[in-house]
From Swiss-Prot:
Family: Belongs to the NDK family.
KW Transferase (keyword) present: yes
Name of the protein: Nucleoside diphosphate kinase 4, chloroplastic
Keywords, ordered alphabetically: ATP-binding, Chloroplast, Kinase, Magnesium, Metal-binding, Nucleotide metabolism, Nucleotide-binding, Phosphoprotein, Plastid, Thylakoid, Transferase, Transit peptide
Sample GO molecular function, one term: metal ion binding
pH dependence: Optimum pH is 6.0.
Any one biological process term the GO annotation gives: CTP biosynthetic process
Gene Ontology terms: cellular component: chloroplast thylakoid lumen
Reactions catalysed: a 2'-deoxyribonucleoside 5'-diphosphate + ATP = a 2'-deoxyribonucleoside 5'-triphosphate + ADP; a ribonucleoside 5'-diphosphate + ATP = a ribonucleoside 5'-triphosphate + ADP
Signal sequence interval, chain numbering: none
EC number(s) per entry: 2.7.4.6
Purpose: Major role in the synthesis of nucleoside triphosphates other than ATP. The ATP gamma phosphate is transferred to the NDP beta phosphate via a ping-pong mechanism, using a phosphorylated active-site intermediate. Shows the highest specificity towards GDP.
Active site: H199
Amino acid sequence: MRSQIYRSATKAARSFLSSSKNASSRFLPEGRTVAATAAVSLRVKAPYLASFGGANASGTWMSTALAIPAAAYLLQDQEACAAEFERTFIAIKPDGVQRGLISEIVARFERKGFKLVAIKVVIPSKDFAQKHYHDLSERPFFNGLCDFLSSGPVVAMVWEGEGVIKYGRKLIGATDPQKSEPGTIRGDLAVVVGRNIIHGSDGPETAKDEIKLWFKPEELVNYTHNAEKWIYGDN
């Protein structure tokens, strides 16, 4: 019975949260306003319903009165937490794919605590590669760079986490592997700049543009990772 209560509470909480987005409170943050509304509503109903069902009905409705605001607050808290996290675009280039380095690279981001929210394998056209490297169109190596990116399969990914854009770049290392520190992906796994195995967004705006170029909105998965409380929790 209690599991049914909490499932119903979560469903009701989602409904409250959805409707509250169109009418925010002047006095309380959105989640707390919704929770308070749910609690007040059920406290009014509980005595009335209890008169028909006795103590068990009263206990059930009071449990629900506690469950709905709690669920609403937790859902709101999850949404707020997710909104704080950055997202970055990471691509394993054809050389990294052909050398069998996919799992090695993915593992490094996972071990850091970042969350994978999108991944696919594609062979981009040269036109697509030119769109990706549009900011380098005036550089002498532009044509060769686009030829290489479109020469084979690319593993395109979106990673999420606190500081993922800046730290992702540190994790990747300098563009020239010869200048990359040991411990970085390029420092450990690449030798020359023309085969530096991986690409990562260099800033928030670039990340947004690259994610939009490579992925449709529905390909990005929003979810709460079970390890997040062990990664981001406060003591």
